[in-house]
From Swiss-Prot:
The keyword Nucleotide-binding applies. Keywords: Aminoacyl-tRNA synthetase, ATP-binding, Cytoplasm, Ligase, Nucleotide-binding, Protein biosynthesis. It catalyses: tRNA(Arg) + L-arginine + ATP = L-arginyl-tRNA(Arg) + AMP + diphosphate. The gene is argS. A motif ('HIGH' region) lies at residues 122-132. GO terms for biological process: arginyl-tRNA aminoacylation. PANTHER family: ARGININE--TRNA LIGASE, CYTOPLASMIC, ARGINYL-TRNA SYNTHETASE. NCBIfam families: argS. It holds the Pfam family Arg_tRNA_synt_N. GO terms for molecular function: arginine-tRNA ligase activity; ATP binding. PROSITE patterns: AA_TRNA_LIGASE_I. It comes from Salmonella paratyphi A (strain AKU_12601). Its main location: cytoplasm. This is Arginine--tRNA ligase. Belongs to the class-I aminoacyl-tRNA synthetase family.
Length: 577
């Protein structure tokens, strides 16, 4: 149930009845403070201005038409014309009861869309590093949320599997296989790439061979395609191990690398020329965009084909957007790519729109994110200044969590300890990132992320187990509890219930904006409200069975909401800690 949407509809109808235009915005928001009720309608200011009347006067007229019987216990005008809405306890009780009857906790399904989500995108023949973490886990949280809401989501892992470097890599792979007799595991991808590059720079005969191999690969030679495929397979097999460790839903089937679009590129260049969008300039094919200016203030030239006939990332991205609309039938496309690529994407999409490849009705959205920084405020590096491998980071997370869990549970069996350490360690790394607004840089800090207090994964996982422990102590049959009524008479019960019922609103924001930190903040708030409720409203020692069972149902909805919310973030929950 989306209470915000219900109230928006009711307030909008009342505003129209009071003389507001049919497209008026009621601007119903969750109230920031308890004294302002559960929701506040702020739309009177803008509409009153259009009608040439005082906002408070409009608010008074709206109130005469606003029927919230059975929903609100009190509606009042505050300040210059805000309408504060206090929800009726009986309404809250009824909605809690309804939410508990469905696995989806009463979350309604929006109109189903096909949504393509572009995320992770590591490079072939290189190990994933910390720079891939944000795109991978933020993108996956968006995917999980959209799928939970009922959308058809297509994961697109736009891996870097094409380019001139593959001549060098194939030549080096060939040399290694000749010297090491048969196949090699390529265990050290980073070392493999580094050695290939060193030979390319120092050995002219090797470099010449590499350049010839690029031409053969690009012309579709079977042997070179096989060698290229081997490099892709080895890399993606290693990456899959990382995805599985991260509890990320990407699989090999989601790989849609740069190479996928190669056959489209000549046709796109020819089409852009035919449409008069692309012109020859100094031997290259260029699209000049009035929307972007160069240093001289002239339209910026975006190269789509080089003098030597080679294509650029922009050309691939144009083809990619076209493919996602025409072949995948996307209604919406989300790109989880760091903020430094913003201008590049905007240029590619401007060309896409001008060429008519994707209509304006299909949003292309750059959900950009900032950088992961060390405690010194500089990009996160190893002690020697190198790039941190993602596998090494996860190993350290597991080791630190293992120590932490063993300290708190010295008698825990080894297999249980390992399972718990994995949930806490990986959860801590992911949640520390997901709980920050993705558009900003954030400081990576082991101590903060593994703390059992504050907005952290260990705190949220512990909060969940704490609610479950109430049920273990209550020793009650869930079926027997199902028929018990929900009674809301205390303020803390009402506050917890109202917040729990905002789960759908939170999911809707995450789905619309691609901002998992909103879900983290919501769940942290729920955990805090439950804590206050637990302290001030005795559950197991309640004055009678009716109150006890009602409070157990609030605890039950809290547990289900925390579990489901954390699941949309890809954070594992545990039964005991």
């Amino acid at each position: 149930m989306n209470i915000q949407a219900l109230l928006s509809e009711k307030v909008s109808q009342a505003m129209i009845a009071a003389g507001a235009p049919a497209d008026c915005e009621p601007q119903v928001r969750q109230s920031a403070k308890v004294q302002f009720g559960d929701y506040q309608a702020n739309g009177m200011m803008a509409v009153a201005k259009k009608l040439g009347m005082a906002p408070r006067q409009l608010a008074e007229q709206v109130l005469t038409h606003l029927d919230l019987s059975g929903i609100a216990s009190k509606v009042e005008i505050a300040g210059p014309g805000f309408i504060n809405i206090f929800l009726e306890p009986a309404f809250l009780a009824e909605q809690v009861q309804q939410a508990l009857t469905s696995d989806r906790l009463g979350v309604s399904q929006p109109t189903r869309q096909t949504i393509v989500v572009d995320y992770s995108a590591p490079n072939v023949a290189k190990e994933m590093h910390v720079g891939h973490l944000r795109s991978t886990i933020i993108g996956d949280a968006a995917v999980r949320t959209l799928e939970f809401l009922g959308h058809h989501v297509i994961r697109a892992n736009h891996v870097g599997d094409w380019g001139t470097q593959f001549g060098m890599l194939i030549a080096w792979l060939e040399k290694q296989q000749q010297e090491n007799a048969g196949d090699m595991a390529l265990a050290d991808l980073e070392g493999f790439y580094r050695d290939a590059k060193k030979h390319y720079d120092e050995d002219e005969a090797f470099a010449e061979r590499a350049r010839n191999y690029v031409v053969k690969l690009q012309s579709g030679d079977t042997y070179f395609r096989e060698m290229w495929r081997k490099l892709v397979d080895i890399t993606m097999t290693q990456n899959q191990i990382t995805y599985d460790r991260l509890n990320v839903t990407l699989t090999r089937d989601d790989v849609m690398g740069e190479s996928l679009y190669n056959p489209m590129l000549p046709g796109i260049v020819a089409d852009l020329k035919a449409k008069g969008l692309a012109v020859e300039s100094e031997g290259a094919t260029v699209v000049f965009l009035d929307e972007f200016k160069n240093k001289e203030g002239d339209p910026m030239g975006v190269i789509i084909q080089k003098k030597d006939g080679g294509y650029l990332y922009t050309t691939t991205d144009i083809a990619c957007a076209k493919y996602r609309y025409e072949t995948l039938h996307a209604d919406r496309v989300l790109y989880y790519i760091d903020s430094r690529q913003h201008q590049h994407l905007m240029q590619a999409w401007t060309i896409v729109r001008k060429a008519g490849y994707v209509p304006d009705s299909v949003p292309l959205e750059h959900h950009m994110f900032g950088m992961m920084l060390g405690k010194d405020g500089k990009p996160f590096k190893t002690r020697t200044g190198g790039t941190v491998k993602l596998a090494d980071l996860l190993d350290e997370a597991l080791e630190r969590a293992r120590r932490l869990v063993a300290e708190k549970n010295p008698d825990m069996p080894a297999d249980e300890l390992e399972k718990l350490a994995n949930a806490v360690g990986i959860g801590a790394v992911k949640y520390a990132d997901l709980s920050k607004n993705r558009t900003t840089d954030y400081i990576f800090d082991w101590d903060n992320m593994l703390a059992f207090e504050g907005n952290t994964a260990p705190y949220m996982q512990y909060a969940y187990t704490r609610v479950l422990s109430v049920f273990r102590k209550a020793d009650i049959d869930e079926q027997a509890l199902a028929s018990a009524p929900v009674i809301i008479s205390e303020d803390r019960e009402a506050q917890l219930a109202a917040r729990l019922l905002q789960f759908e609103e939170t999911l809707t924001v995450v789905a619309r904006e691609g901002t998992p930190h909103v879900m983290c903040a919501y769940l942290y708030d729920v955990a805090g409200l439950f804590s206050g409720f637990y302290e001030h409203c005795p559950i197991l020692s309640a004055e009678n069975d009716a109150v006890r069972n009602s409070r157990l149902k609030l605890a039950q909805l809290t547990a289900k909401t925390l579990k489901l919310g954390l699941d949309t973030l890809g954070i594992e929950t545990v039964e005991r800690m």
